[in-house]
Every structure is written in C-alpha cells, then in structure tokens.
Amino acid sequence: GYTLADGLEYIRTGIAAGLNIDAFAPRLSFFWGMGKNYFMEVAKMRAGRVLWAKIIKEFGPKLDKSMALRTHCQTSGWSLTAQDPFNNVGRTCMEAMAAALGHTQSLHTNALDEAIALPTDFSARIARNTQLYIQDETRVCKVVDPWGGSYYVEALTDELIKRAWGHIQEVEKLGGMAKAIETGLPKMRIEEAAARRQARIDSGRENIVGLNYMQLEHEDAIDILEVDNTAVREAQIARLNKLRANRDNEKVQQCLDAITKSVETGEGNLLELAVEAARARASLGEISMAVEKVCGRHKAVIRSISGVYSKESSDTAAIERVRKMTDEFEKREGRRPRIMV
C-alpha cells in the first residue's frame, strides 16, 4: 500500500507541474521486495496491478499502458540467514519463482552469503543461474497469470487489495505520502510489523531452518569475500582528488550555484541543472549539498512502538523475567540498563 501511495504522490506532483498523465505514467516503475511466503507474494503483485490501475483511472488516461504497473523485484535480504547459509539457495529460488509467477518485468536474485558479506563469484553465479533456469528451463514465464482462477490465490489477492487500500486511505487522510512521512506514520507501521515478525521467530512460533529449527550441531565456515574498507576509502578519496584537480572548478561552481538558486526561487528545471553539474564533473555529494544549503536534510520523525513484541510473543514468562531483572537493575544502579544495538 505504501509503495502505491508513493506512486500516487509522484502522479499528483507531475500533473501539478503541467505534465499530461499519458506522457509520464507509462514511464513509472516500482520496486518490490519478494518474501518467502510464496502465495502471499504472488497475490501481492496481482493486487498491486489492480490497485495501480484503479489509482490511475481517476486521472483520466487515454492510453491503456498508463494503467499498467511495471516492476522490478528483488528477493528478500531479510529472509537470508547467516546460520547454515546454503539454505538461502532454496529460499531465494522460491522467492524468485513467486516473482516470476507474479510477472515481474526484471529480477534480482540475492546470493546465499549476503547475510554475511558481499557475494563471492561462486555465490553470485548461483544467484544468477537461479533466475536463468527459472526463465529458460521451467517455461513458467511463458504463461500469463497461471494462478488466476485459483480459489486461494484469488481470495488472498482480494484480501490484500482491501488491506492495502486501507493503508492508502490512511495516508490520504494525512494529506498524501509526503505529509505522512513527516508524521512518521509509515515508518512506525513498518516497525510494528517487523517487531511482530521478530517476536514470532524469537518465540519459535515461526520456524527458520538452521536458525531456530533444525540447527546444525557443528557448522563449517564458508569462504566469504574479504574487503579492505580502509583501502577502498583511500582509493575513492584519491579518485575524487584527481577528479577535482583535472576539472574546470569555476564551471562546476557556476553549476552548483545555479542549483542552489533554483531551489531558492523555485524556478528552472532542477533535474536538468543537476545533469549539467554532473557533466561538469561535480560529485553527487556536491550536488546534494547545493540543494541542502536551502532546504536542509530530512530527519525522520521517531515514533517509538511499545507492547507490540510482547503481545505477539508466546514466551511471556521470559519477557516477565527480563522486566523483573530490569526493575532490579534500576533499583540497584539508579537507572535503566542501556543496550547497544
């Protein structure tokens, strides 16, 4: 729901700038993360297409393709485990299959070791080949909406449409996604969902093979990609210094000043000015700072959640023990315990 509400915000902004809906709606695309709840993920993509068409119809498009939802998908990084990581091959495969059957236009498959480090050539090859054999060997991409007509998938799609539309309406009541973000509501809702999920895992209500279920007694270390962060940082600094030494810095400053002036006055095409600055070899950081001089940098509103984890967890005795220990610590030390996360 929030992703589509983002899209709605872009649509309104484009129209307010004088663009015709058919001139830019077909060029919008979305990015979905694919989880391991297979049928849910297929239904999610089907529901997204229905809702996006419903949203765009309100703006009176003349072209059917304006109502088509184009999407890139990436398998979940959240579902990957550092423990017994070869299980991640199966997880990623199922998530990729859900994306394919949900008709993604493009796909990124995560490598098995990405919960630990950047992928090696070995793990990256397995990740790449996973989507290649789904595409080329299974032929599932040759069928349009293969789950259409399934009672379960259709019912799940309908349920997701209703629930996601409720989230969109909640955002609309706040004045749109930009204003909703300022209130911190979407962030809070996402954190609530994450806390509920973590509680189910920690309490054993949700099994994660190799993590809280069917763990290995002894786990052999796997080869991972070692990166010297200090060397990378020094190399990047050297590249920037070389760039600044060989460019026309007067031209760069003129471009950056033009960006700042555009933000101040609201006149001119900011994207065009940023492209011009990049052509003059201004860095991304310099371009961002030229904007930040006027409008500052966004700081998320922090709205803490409470009671979500304990309500979802079945291990209430353990939670009560922690509360008791915390109270005893406070009496003894005069303060609540601090936890570094």
Which residues make up each language-model segment?
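Helix-rich catalytic cores of soluble enzyme domains
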Residues: G1-A98, A111-R128
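Short coil/turn connectors at secondary-structure junctions
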Residues: A25-R27, K65-L69, H103-Q105, G266, ...
